[in-house]
Amino acid sequence: MRQEYHVSPQGRDMWEGSQEKPFATISRAAEEAEKGDVIVVHAGTYREWVKPKRGGSHPLNRVTFQAAAGEKVVIKGSEIVDNWSLVEGTVWKAVIPNKLFGEYNPYIQTIDGDWMIEPTGWKVHAGEVYLNGNAFYEARTLDDVKNPEVREYIVYPGDGHKEFYLNPQDTLYQWYAEVEAETTSIYANFQGADPNRELVEVNVRKCCFYPEKTGIDYITVKGFEMAHAATPWAPPTSEQYGMIGTHWSKGWIIENNIFHDSKCSAVSLGKEASTGEGLSYRYKQKSGYQHQLEAVFAGLKNGWSREKIGSHIVRNNTIYDCGQNGIVGNMGCAFSKIHGNHIYNIGIKHEFFGWEIAGIKFHAPIDTDITGNRIHHCTLGFWMDWQAQGTRISRNLLYQNDRDGNIEVTHGPLIIDNNIFASDYGFDNHAQGTAFVNNMICGRMYKVNILDRSTPYHLPHSTEVAGYSFVYGGDDRYFNNIFVGNQGKRAGNAFYGTNGYDGHTISYREFVKKAATGPGQDHENYTSVRQPVYMKHNVYLNGARAFAKETEQYTNCGFHPEILIEERADGVYLEFTMPKGITEILSENVNTEKLGDLIIADTVYDAPDGMPLLLGQDYFGNTRRRKSAPGPFDYLQEGKNRLKIW
């Protein structure tokens, strides 16, 4: 019979957990909860790591953790420190007994692991200091704390472009830690504030809500605020801790929460430790790439399947101010739905850099649906890496990111449709088999073949591995998109539009004929002959250029659409101008048949249940007319358009 437990700061853990005699901690309620039970948490701040002991048995028989209606409930991984002594100037020192941290001291734990690149010469730590909720910056030395310098930008290791800090003056608030046998001393520059009169908190716990055991299925978490987790680096070759995480389970619902200030990742749908734990970084015997290949098979042996792992729902959450990811996952994110989340300020402190940082970073998101999210002011909006097969990215809003998207070493089918990509740097396409349909793409793009890393593809709608392949580039589709250029200015190796595909074949028949009659031996011809691409009814403005063999397209190089994203108190608005004749450019909606078959994965673009797919909704979710406008909106008008988009 369903039981309802209550938790309140005024409660006692020795009480029965009723509304009249509530528990004092969420962890105490979690010890009692069985399938079907509900834990109602009342207003207050709970400084604990909640580790659910048991989950539900099926989607309708869950263990539910929820904030009481209309009440603010905060779970923090930090503790208050109020014993500061003045060192000199605006620098103060606090001495903390190590027993406060238990077995995990964030001021010893470094942010490192596979694919961690910077900083070099020293290590950033999982600890953090907060003044009235605002996070500081770790300093390399105590002298740097005493003499801080403003950090204005970092140079991105990928292509050398500059990424600027949003609030450079905040970088003057710095801290440094010294750890001894019994104590940890934290030095911090409070820039004139008295830390004994203000709220000062420091990271203590690794997570806020994360089960110790795997297989804790069908948990619901809703209505909470969580903050200040000392999460470690979360590459796909290690256990991926998050401030909240599913830990290799099935069927969680994480909804209507606020997550912020996780040192690395906020929400984890990731892998667990037995399938590999930073082996390349630790032992240097094999590359991270090789260990990640092994992790796929280890995951399959450890239950990775639609029946046992994934199928999570992460919706309507606000996620911000995290160092690595808003949402992260490898394998455990498969078959999931990521809907309606607002993700921003991810990776923008630039304290560390590695090849795993994005608002959403997934490996193997098989049949995962990413719809209706708003992602902005991130170093990278989304990154679909390895085995993004059956994945759909639809009706999302991305803007003011250093880069909107990256798709890497995956072979399709991947559908990207009805999105607004408004940042200056649009995409890195290091993949094949992607369909871009009805998007507005305002930034530059890069296309790269990957011929030194062969990655898996799967049987349709399954985790079962069907084979491996390099990324030859191509086998992509572009239908009904609006591309906006940079007025014809040079963009290095980047391109605006689809002219980066010039030289590709344009049909399966042409590709097969050239590969079959080439001069090379077997696989050599498939490296030299470019895979086909399919393009139709795209619009190219302001210097964006079309693929040389796209015959049905609209180009107006001199027309500037003057795209503007405006954030207002009542929402987000998009303003843009369209040229004359745009209302006459109509095309039929795209479906499974039109998208055709894929070369490497040897499958089609269909729905997760295997049924034919119709891309028949626009950005707003409205049903498109049988013939509708290019871009993410069913209706366009000549001249100025102004739309509320969030």
Residue ranges, per PLM feature:
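Extracellular polysaccharide-degrading/modifying enzymes targeting complex plant/algal/animal polysaccharides
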Residues: 4-248, 260, 268, 274-304, ...
